[in-house]
Regions:
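Conserved class I S-adenosyl-L-methionine
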Residues: 1-38, 76, 83
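C-terminal alpha-helical "lid/dimerization" subdomain adjacent to the S-adenosyl-L-methionine
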Residues: 15-21, 137-201
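Class I SAM-dependent methyltransferase SAM/SAH-binding core
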Residues: 44-98
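Short amphipathic alpha-helix with an adjacent loop that forms part of the alpha/beta core around
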Residues: 98-104
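A conserved beta-strand element that flanks and buttresses the S-adenosyl-L-methionine
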Residues: 110
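Short catalytic micro-motifs in class I SAM-dependent methyltransferases
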Residues: 113-114
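A short glycine-rich, Lys/Arg-flanked "PGG" loop and its adjoining helix->strand segment in the class I
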Residues: 122-137
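C-terminal lobe and adjacent flexible extensions of AdoMet/dcAdoMet transferase-like proteins
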Residues: 202-207
Length: 207
């Protein structure tokens, strides 16, 4: 993923940003509300960063694999896990755009602000389907479609997603019971001033 270097640079101060903290807590609350989480579940967070979202959910889940392709983020994550003394959170260096799929299968896969960085989102959704056990749940929190101002000039990923287009992609990948909810309203300073960007939560199941 092209943003690896910038995420490595951001990793040491990521957890100090109150917006990152607030966003993770809001999405965790939305996931709890929409998915019947269980401490018997094995879960995968893809694009976990420093682990803010999974730390907010860790008491609701069993073993959690926290996967990311940024070495800097994973270094901070490992320190966070060690400091908290949590033995059911497991870091994993993984980039599904290039790496082989893990052998493990999961009851839940979730992402936060990851999908818009992945060039081939359709393929990633298909990978998520493969990685889920039958009856498993998927939760994707990401940007609603925007005008490109969120990242600014030079960004090569997706400028958010149209909900109905993503719904169709999820159905095409094999998912069922696809629903969308607004999970967070993010305020961000841009070249055009302070802007608001809604984040959706897409929830789906593998039949």
């Amino acid at each position: 993923m092209s943003a690896t270097l910038s995420f490595d640079d951001k990793a040491p101060t990521w957890d100090a940003n109150p917006v990152n903290q607030e966003r993770a807590l809001a999405v965790a609350a939305a996931l709890r509300q929409r998915i019947p989480l269980s401490t018997s579940w094995q879960a995968l967070e893809y694009g976990c960063g420093t682990g803010l979202l999974s730390f907010a959910l860790q008491a609701d889940l069993g073993a959690v694999t926290l996967a990311d392709c940024s070495p800097g983020m994973l270094t901070v994550l490992e320190k966070n896990i060690s400091a908290a003394g949590l033995t059911h959170l497991h870091p994993l260096a993984l980039d599904l755009t290039t790496d082989t799929l893990p052998a493990e299968r999961y009851d839940l896969i979730y992402t936060l602000m990851t999908l818009h960085h992945v060039p081939d989102a359709t393929r990633l959704l298909q990978d998520f389907y493969t990685l889920l056990r039958p009856g498993g749940w998927l939760g994707i929190a990401d940007l609603d479609q925007e005008d490109g101002s969120f990242h600014g000039a030079g960004f090569t990923g997706h400028c958010g997603f149209d909900r109905e287009a993503l719904r169709a992609q999820l159905f095409s990948a094999g998912f069922s019971h696809v629903d969308f909810f607004t999970s967070y309203l993010m305020k961000k300073a841009t070249d055009q001033g302070l802007r608001e960007y809604p984040l959706f939560l897409a929830v789906a199941t593998r039949p």
